[in-house]
Every structure is written in structure tokens, then in C-alpha cells.
Amino acid sequence: MHSRKICVSLGQPTMPQALEASLRIFGADVIEVRLDYIDVPEIDPFVESLATDLLFTCRPTWEGGLFAGTEEDRLALLAEAVRAGAAYIDLELRSAEESHQYLRTYLAERETELILSYHDFESTATLAKLTGIIDQMQDAGADIGKLITTANSAADVVRVFQVLEYAAKKGLPLIAFCMGEAGAVSRVASCDLGGYMTYCCADGAEVTAAGQITISEMRGIFARYP
């Protein structure tokens, strides 16, 4: 049984633009608010305006994002998202241990789920390394793992699919697919191979990651291949 859960990522640079874009999204199961893209990010306007489950991400520059502020300020935004009732927050696996401890403490007895994420913007590592990353995510207390690599060949995509199987055996819900043109198929197929969720961009919006497709395109593919 596949989930085919779709998350639409918002990448607008201002609060008014991001809010307006979020209200025009139809058919998404989750909306990801990229706080690192917004010039003066706020949490409450999204929570108050949207009934869709919200995922808040504040990706630092060292993991391919735009946030260049202090770790204290970044964690404060994520903690505020938890307080406001976010369904998910995304924290990088490679964040400092102190950051992990802070958010684990803040998440205690709250319903927000923690996604621990890992991104490789150049390649896809060996299967042994990738499964080791899954072990690290589970050991670090992830509710959901997120493993995103860059595919330079079909073999890279196959390895990521093997990681989905490994995570399922470990009991860790996992988001896993490949960026890049060679990995575009994985964004669709991962949902049918045990992936927890896939990511799209809104119709008419700029992509927030290489190889990303729009939600209408994704829904169309799912409809053709039920």
C-alpha cells in the first residue's frame, strides 16, 4: 500500500508572497514553508490561514539553504513553529548535537514530528554509507528520515530505492529520492516503493530543487497510474 503523500514547497522571498502562494495551492497533503527563503519570516500567519498540515524548514547555507544567521536564531524559528502547532519541522542530521538536544527537549510531549534530513547535492554515495546515514537518523531520534541525493545515473536511483527498503525493515518512515534530471523518476516512484512523502513545487512557481515537478504534473501521473 502506497501513501502518495505530496508536499508542496514554498520558495517566495517575502511573507505576503509566500502567504498568497500558499492560499493558491490545491491538492497538497503538506505545505513546506521555507523560512530561510523569506526575508522576515513569521510562523503564525501560516498557521492561522491554512488548514493543511505545515512543515517548517529553515535550511542553513551549509546544507544548501539561504539562512546565514546564527544557530540560536534558526532554532528559535523552528521552536516557534512547534509552539504554533506545526505538523512537522525539518532539522539537518548534520546539525550540531546541541541543536538536536535543544529541539528534542522542546518536542517532548508535543505532536509535531521531527524530520531529520540529509542532502547530497553532488552525488549518491555507496549503499553502505547511505544505510549508515539511516542508522544515524534513527539513533538521533528522527520521527521521519529524509535522504535526498543527486543522481548521475540510473544506478544511483536504484541505490536510493534500496535504502527505502532498508529503512522499512528498520521501522523508520523515510522520504528518499534523487535530485537532478536523472533522478526525476524517483520523485514519483518513491511513493510506491515505501517512501513517506514526495516534494513538488506549486503550479507556476519556480522549482526549489533540481528535477522538481509541479503538483499538477505529479497528481496527473498518479491519476494515470493508480
Swiss-Prot record:
Residues given in the record as 3-dehydroquinate binding sites: S9, E32, V33, R34, R59, R187, T208, Q212
EC numbers: 4.2.1.10
UniProt keyword terms in alphabetical order: Amino-acid biosynthesis, Aromatic amino acid biosynthesis, Lyase, Schiff base
Top enzyme category: lyase
Superkingdom, natural source: Bacteria
Gene3D superfamilies, sorted: Aldolase class I
Molecular function (Gene Ontology), one example: 3-dehydroquinate dehydratase activity
GO biological process terms on file: 3,4-dihydroxybenzoate biosynthetic process; amino acid biosynthetic process; aromatic amino acid family biosynthetic process; chorismate biosynthetic process
Active site per database record: H119 (proton donor/acceptor), K146 (schiff-base intermediate with substrate)
Involved pathway(s): Metabolic intermediate biosynthesis; chorismate biosynthesis; chorismate from D-erythrose 4-phosphate and phosphoenolpyruvate: step 3/7
Function: Involved in the third step of the chorismate pathway, which leads to the biosynthesis of aromatic amino acids. Catalyzes the cis-dehydration of 3-dehydroquinate (DHQ) and introduces the first double bond of the aromatic ring to yield 3-dehydroshikimate.
Family that this chain belongs to: Belongs to the type-I 3-dehydroquinase family.
NCBIfam families linked to this entry: aroD (TIGR01093)
Record protein name field: 3-dehydroquinate dehydratase
Organism in which the protein naturally occurs: Desulfotalea psychrophila (strain LSv54 / DSM 12343)
Gene that produces this protein: aroD
